[in-house]
Amino acid sequence: MREIVTITASHRANHLITQFFNGQERALHERDEQAGSDPSVFLHGTIDADGRTMSYEPRAVLWDAKGGSGALGRFQYWSQDDYADEEEPPRAAPGIEVVQTAARVRRSAYQRALDAGEAPPALTAAGARYWSDYGRMIYGQDSVQELAHWHHDVAAPSAPDFEALGQRRFDRYENGYEVFTEECARDFFDISLHRQLEQCDTLQGFNLVTETDNGWGGFMAALQEQLREEVPKVCYFGWGLNVDESGPRHPPRAGFQRQSNKLRATLAMLEQSDLYFPIRSEAADSLWEAGGWACHVLDSVNSAMCLEKSRTLRFMNQLADRLHSGDEQRNVVSLMSSGQRSYSYFADAPRHRSSRGDPHTFSRCRLLRGSHSPPETTLSVENLELIRTYAWRPADTIPETARNLHHIDLGVTEKCRDVFKNWYEMVAKQFRYDPDREELKERLGTLGAAYECGWYSDDDSGDDT
């Protein structure tokens, strides 16, 4: 087998991965004989007691803040002691006082329908505040993990609240790095990861999905750094979720902190990943809607890794080799687009003052979903490799506006140079007292040069700051 384990960190990332696994659940029932997917790549199957059916659970570990899983109990569906219907008040033995420490979260109408074996209602943003409100698969007993001291805030789901006191937020890269290293690493490696690896025969790699704007980026950076040491000989795809900066403005100090978080998390993840995908999300979209759109890319990339019959591609490292195009240092996928929209945060970055003309494309490929053929005009694009995979099967949880998808274009372009050069200047001008300032400048300068096509003079580089 060619198993892929997915690890997510943050409420936004869990919305995305819920949409992805809902699609995997649908694929179990609608497999295409000619270009079908192998469910064992992303799902662990066990034979039921009757010996005639199989049950599947995602090969995944999900991290969230305390209470971030909503109405889903950690051992719900595994132990009745962990389940309480929201219509029933807590029961206690005589003489025992029940203390409620957080507001009770009721199951969504969608989940109540699934649990009752009924047809679920259509989803709306209001009915999908938590990723567990519309999850169609049951996760393993150790797959859903929560931070011990940082509580989920419905009003600010990307900024967990320390002990729910309203005084400290999980909004700094350093916070996340420290929390994983000191509080979460041991249980993750000894319990959650160990269980996932035990269920794999031939692990091909990991998908690591997180936000970059807040403490979760540091959390995933620490996790990936240690994971790469623990499991070194597999492929790593990093997925960084970035909220569009053109959305609601933040106070100057908060805006700078978000940029600092984004810079550090992106550098940490891309240096530990074989391919890094900087995903852009509209600030106006709900997490449910943003997850539905981002699933276009996540599902398309991973669909190429689980084909039962493929003449072109079967493994993560094969896609990485195609996009590296001979230079493993160029591992940022800055082109991600379909006929509907661009999904890349890097693609919308402002041009650096030294940039010349349109950015050069080093490599690109098109993932065709099913039998749909692209227009002839796009087939003439130079160096465009076509990779055909199975048809896009959107789950009923994908927003209606995001259910059409024929292809996804991926590419490594010179646009990365703009990002790294702009970040270089930001570090040089604003990171005056950071102890790692010179190290960051060196790393950004090296990365910027790796994505240059042609000759740039020293005056063009902007590296004299």
From Swiss-Prot:
Single biological process term from Gene Ontology: plasmid maintenance
Cysteine-cysteine disulfides: none
Entry keyword set: Mitochondrion
Top-level taxon in the UniProt lineage: Eukaryota
CC terms in the record's Gene Ontology section: cytoplasm; mitochondrion
Flavoprotein keyword on record: no
Matches recorded under SUPFAM superfamilies: Tubulin nucleotide-binding domain-like
Location within or outside the cell: Mitochondrion
Key word Signal present: no
PANTHER family, per database record: MITOCHONDRIAL DISTRIBUTION REGULATOR MISATO, PROTEIN MISATO HOMOLOG 1
The protein's role, per its UniProt record: Involved in the partitioning of the mitochondrial organelle and mitochondrial DNA (mtDNA) inheritance.
Family as reported in the entry's similarity comment: Belongs to the misato family.
Name the record gives this protein: Protein DML1
Organism listed in the record: Eremothecium gossypii (strain ATCC 10895 / CBS 109.51 / FGSC 9923 / NRRL Y-1056) (Yeast)
Name of the encoding gene: DML1
